[in-house]
Swiss-Prot record:
Keyword Cytoplasm: yes
Organism: Saccharomyces cerevisiae (strain ATCC 204508 / S288c)
Entry superkingdom: Eukaryota
Entry's family note: Belongs to the tubulin--tyrosine ligase family.
Gene Ontology MF term list: ATP binding; hydrolase activity; tubulin-tyrosine ligase activity
Keyword field: Cytoplasm, Ligase, Magnesium, Potassium
Coiled-coil intervals: none
GO cellular component, one term: P-body
Protein name: Probable tubulin--tyrosine ligase PBY1
Gene transcribed to yield this protein: PBY1
Its job: Probable P-body-associated tubulin--tyrosine ligase.
Highest classification ranks of the organism: Eukaryota, Fungi, Dikarya, Ascomycota, Saccharomycotina
EC number: 6.3.2.25
Disulfide bonding pattern of the chain: none
Length: 753
């Protein structure tokens, strides 16, 4: 790996830059495969941020130090390199007095950002893989320090003008004691590199650069905890004092640069005088999240993922009209109703986004009484609630006043047997559709009781033929059409297997009725929860689908089968958006190929490795390892991930067009509603995507606590593009370009609204 190292404290120095030599020496000793280039300011350039000295031509000097030096002595400076460096663009002379294994320091009379820029573009014939900026003498935590930091500025320059990954490193000393022992600097170097290695290996795709802070405390060790931490949004006070008046002759002109008698303002920062910004984010005040400043004060290591940008305020876009028009929202009786339980997983992401984009609109928890006659013409009410809480009469009668988060009719997609019929009808008319290969062969049967299975198969002779064809090595999966959370799913091969499955359902129902206990069949060890029993007579509709026997398996995840959960948002009639931050949900156990001689269709232990629904995994086990963000899976190459997402976009496009065109009775998108669906996909060993099912009101809490930010961003985008235009029609004109993770795949009008 080729690494460029810069800083803002300058070259090795007891007074100004005591940390960089031990840090580089540690890299040289422990990572000899790293090809490092050191390019730093020729003197200390702290507090300059990402500045350049515009108009100034910069020059270079070169100094050299021993790899095993115990002090900050060096050879030089020289006006050109004294040793030959691999892939260097610079001319050199061979100086016999300087050993070949010395550390070369390239000193530029500019800023850290200039050093990064020159280093990336003008020093080497080979590109760099990483830029390390630091270690800074002192912490770089909080908005006040980070925005001023030359260390962070050098890293940011690497991203903006070099498109190179960068990490800013800062070593935080305490009680003003910046000179610490060599042993402590060695520990700080090791721990810094531990964090750097992890970040490089697990680089977040949405992150441009990282800022890490290492506490210089005697307790620093391999056990010192590391925390992702947001920047403390603080505010400071003046960092100068004065004016100081020393005017011996107020009429004198400045000569020879002597300004000692002028009015002066002296550098005098008060490092303890900080306070919270008024914009300090609410979620950081609940004390469940420590800021970078709090982490380092707790003598732990902070890691702050950053974008190389001065963050804009996303909800203020477009033309600024200095008229009363922009205040109209606050002069109406517009209302937002959020009737879901405040303890629900999605309540905070939803209300946070609503307050962010629609601060003028009041949020209440109950829908007020109003009707078509009593509703003001300009009044608009957006109601977010469970399906049963929404007023479907108002949704139909007041299309200009009442808006909801759900359509009324969408069985064509969310009921498995309806979905199968929708796709089969559409592909019959459109054989070139991706759905032809992306939806596994499926059949539907209606069954009241297990003993009527033979009659049901007589009515579906194509299915009977498939099941009786012993020459085929197909396996099948049976699912109740109207169940969710994995209830009633079983894998089988023959008609006898299917009969045994339905008989077991009836047996379980009978036993539960006799015992009065629905939990009798649960696994006593809690490893796999048999909460997926069903009552045949209550569900009646079943889908039988070809089982994918060659799923993509990942060695890094113990070869456990997984499916992708993708959130799809439909707006009006009809725009469809795919949220590209997808989840991968893994089965509890490693995948075991199906063996007709070993597999028991009624033994839930055999089923455990085939079902990826985390709802079926024991509450006694930690489920964190079963849910990952899809983009974080390193074993799948990036080009494969991109292709998988492209397939998902195409499948989503076709399945929603299918519903709106061939099954309009059962999918009726409305102009005054939107809806979020959880769409599940499988990937086979050839990286081909298969559509599993579409869920209305998906179980967002499967995402878990660690990936909550994924849901936060989803609701931010949903409110921005689906709710804000309800109250501000101007947003309809400016939303042609959505956020990169919120991809529009359909823009279609089916009813002329």
């Amino acid at each position: 790996m080729r690494v460029l190292i810069t800083n803002d404290d300058g070259p090795l120095s007891d007074q100004f830059s005591p940390y960089i030599r031990p840090f580089i020496q540690h890299i040289k000793r422990n990572y000899p495969e790293w090809k490092i280039t050191v390019c730093v300011p020729h003197v200390q350039k702290s507090w300059v941020g990402k500045a350049h000295l515009a108009g100034k031509n910069l020059t270079a000097q070169f100094i050299y130090s021993k790899v095993d030096a115990e002090d900050n002595t060096f050879w030089g400076p020289f006006i050109q390199p004294q040793i030959r460096s691999e892939n260097s663009k610079l001319p050199y002379v061979l100086n016999a007095e300087i050993p070949k294994d010395t550390i070369e320091w390239i000193l530029i009379d500019g800023t850290p950002a200039s050093c990064a820029n020159i280093g990336l573009h003008l020093l080497s014939n080979e590109p760099f893989d990483l830029v390390l900026s630091g270690p800074n003498v002192g912490r770089n935590t909080s908005a006040a320090y980070i925005t001023s930091s030359g260390t962070v500025g050098g890293a940011m320059e690497s991203v903006i003008t070099g498109n190179t990954k960068a990490i800013a490193i800062s070593w935080a000393y305490f009680n003003g004691l910046k000179n610490v022992s060599p042993l402590l600097m060695e520990k700080a170097s090791k721990r810094s590199l531990d964090v750097i290695k992890h970040l490089v290996k697990n680089w977040d795709p949405k992150t441009d650069l990282y800022s890490i802070n290492i506490p210089l405390v005697e307790s620093l060790s391999d056990d010192t905890k590391v925390y992702y931490a947001p920047i403390w949004e603080n505010r400071w006070i003046p960092i100068f004092n004065g004016p100081h008046i020393n005017l011996e002759n107020s009429f004198a002109e400045i000569e020879d640069g002597n300004e000692s008698s002028s009015i002066s303002f002296n550098w005098a920062p008060k490092f303890g005088a900080h306070k919270d910004s008024i914009h300090y984010m609410d979620e950081y005040k609940d004390r469940t999240v420590l800021t970078d400043a709090e982490v380092i004060e707790s003598e732990m290591i902070s890691v702050t993922p950053m974008k190389a940008t001065f963050k804009g305020v996303n909800h203020l876009l477009g033309e600024l009209k200095l008229t009363e028009e922009e205040n109209n929202l606050s002069k109406t009786n517009n209302l937002i109703v959020v009737s879901i339980d405040p303890m629900e997983y999605i309540y905070k992401p939803l209300t946070h986004a609503l307050k962010k984009y629609l601060p003028q609109v009041e949020i209440v928890s109950n829908l007020p009484e109003f009707d078509n006659g009593g509703c003001e013409k300009e009044m608009k009410v957006f109601h977010y609630g469970d399906y049963e809480q929404l007023d479907m009469d108002k949704l139909m009668e007041l299309p200009n006043n009442y808006f909801t988060n759900s359509y009324i009719y969408r069985k064509a997609l969310i009921r498995k047997h309806f979905l199968s019929h929708t796709i089969q009808t559409y592909t019959a008319k459109n054989p070139e559709s991706i759905l032809k290969k992306a939806y596994l062969e499926s059949f539907t049967i209606d069954l009241d009781y297990a003993e009527f299975l033979d009659d049901a198969l007589d009515e579906n002779w194509e299915l009977r033929q498939e099941l009786e064809n012993e020459s085929q090595d197909k396996w099948w999966i049976v699912k109740p059409s109207m169940s969710d959370k994995g209830q009633g799913i079983r894998v089988f091969k023959t008609i006898e297997d299917l009969q045994a499955i339905f008989d077991s359902f009836d047996d379980e129902d009978s036993e539960a009725e006799e015992s009065g206990n629905d939990d009798d069949a649960d696994d006593v060890n809690g490893e796999f929860m048999d909460n997926n029993k069903v009552n045949i007579s209550q569900l009646r509709h079943f889908i039988i689908q070809e089982y994918l026997t060659n799923p993509l398996l990942l060695a890094s995840m113990d070869n456990r089968k997984f499916h992708i959960r993708c959130y799809v948002v439909c707006r009006g009639d009809l725009q469809v958006f795919v949220y590209d931050r997808m989840l991968a949900l893994f089965a509890a156990k490693p995948f075991v190929p199906l063996d007709p001689y070993a597999y028991s269709v009624t033994d839930l232990k055999d089923l455990e490795c085939h079902l990826t629904n985390t709802c079926l995994q024991s509450k006694k086990k930690d489920k964190d390892s079963s849910v990952l963000e899809f983009d974080s899976i390193e074993e799948i190459p990036n080009e494969r991930k991109s292709n998988i997402k492209e397939q998902i976009h195409s499948i989503t496009n076709d399945v929603f067009l299918a519903a709106v065109n061939v099954n309009r009775l059962n999918f009726q998108p409305l102009p005054n509603a939107f809806e979020t669906y959880g769409v599940d996909f499988l990937i086979d060993s050839n990286y081909e995507v298969k559509l599993l099912e579409i869920n209305a009101f998906p179980d967002f809490k499967q995402t878990g606590k660690d990936l909550k930010n994924l849901i936060d961003e989803l609701f931010d985008d949903t409110v921005k593009y689906c709710v804000t235009p309800i109250f501000n029609e101007n947003r309809n004109k400016t939303d042609d370009e959505t956020d990169p993770n919120f991809v529009k795949v359909i823009d279609y009008t089916s009813n002329g609204w």
